[in-house]
């Protein structure tokens, strides 16, 4: 929707034009079209995608390098590539996750533009002018569900949620690996003492370690797709005065100020810190309990059970479905990024025709001379977890930035006619920059 209006004032000495525009764009998902619903694959007659899959992919992440060897000496290939089905690990068999359907072809948008332009003649040779422009925009984007994305790289062998089959596959069948299958302790103190004893065995060389070095690629389909809602508001205003000095010279003096406020909200990505805590789980009185809750690191920790109830296809894991919504509230960390920038510009110049000319030239030299000052400041403020890259889908830390500069400039431009067909142009500019760090 767009509206524009305007008219003259004071018997034509002034004029005002205003406008208002509202843009409301509906989202279009890739899954709505045959050509976009399927991630491209290298020639296979199926959808491609990511190996971060709903039942969870687990693969070897350093058994051999750490010094672990299979108890069965006939096993020469240390590598494995599992997924969860029921309470057991089975071969992944190349399963991929088609991430296309939840992604946007077209993002939704809610945008308002408004403003006005005006001028008013003070005298026959001078006028004042002003304009204001306002924009408010919000656009949420959506991409595929979050996941562990390899940020979980080991799981303690005492994990309370391991079935016997899983325990044997990743712990019990390996020489040098410590930790019993799902031990149960009467108190938290006993559980912590047990972990301390395992650390002692590592220290004295009795065992190499007690955490299975396997990497997790689990798609969190039990939660919601990741969303990134970007919003900004901008207001720019300027005032000025311009007119004729005489028949040959004109002037223009103006001042402009602009302010932009920015925000971004990121939802449904998993916290790396909470992922590590929620998978370090031990039995206390028959209840799977986070070690971080026992040692006082995180009293709110909820176990993230990646090992019970793997469903076929893209169904996810039943244990996580059963723990919703509490587990998603704990695991899915929101991030907030705020920012703002401001700019002010002052400019004054004169332009006209001089009394100088090249002999034989068809007209005199024209000139523009002026001064401009600009001040700009910007501040980009990610929250602490964003700066620490505490999101499994982050790809790295988001760096905070802040700073500004100001500049003062003098400029001169000349238009020099030589003949009817030849003109020379010349210009000079002096600029003095200063930053906030000076």
Feature locations, PLM:
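Surface-exposed, low-complexity loop segments enriched in small/polar and acidic residues
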Residues: 26-28, 32-41, 53, 73-109, ...
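Transmembrane beta-strand segments that form the barrel wall of outer-membrane beta-barrel proteins
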Residues: 1, 423-433
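Residue-level signature of outer-membrane beta-barrel architecture
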Residues: 7-9, 118-120, 239, 243, ...
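Predominantly transmembrane beta-strands of Gram-negative outer membrane beta-barrel pores used
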Residues: 1-24, 113-121, 129-133, 240, ...
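Membrane-proximal, glycine/serine-rich, low-complexity loop/turn segments characteristic
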Residues: 1-58, 97
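Membrane-embedded alpha-helical bundles of multi-pass transporters/translocases
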Residues: 6-7, 20, 407, 425-427
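Polar, low-hydrophobicity, Gly/Ser/Thr/Asn/Asp-enriched low-complexity stretches outside signal peptides
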Residues: 1-3, 8-13, 43-45, 61-65, ...
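Solvent-exposed loop/turn segments connecting transmembrane beta-strands
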Residues: 404, 431-438
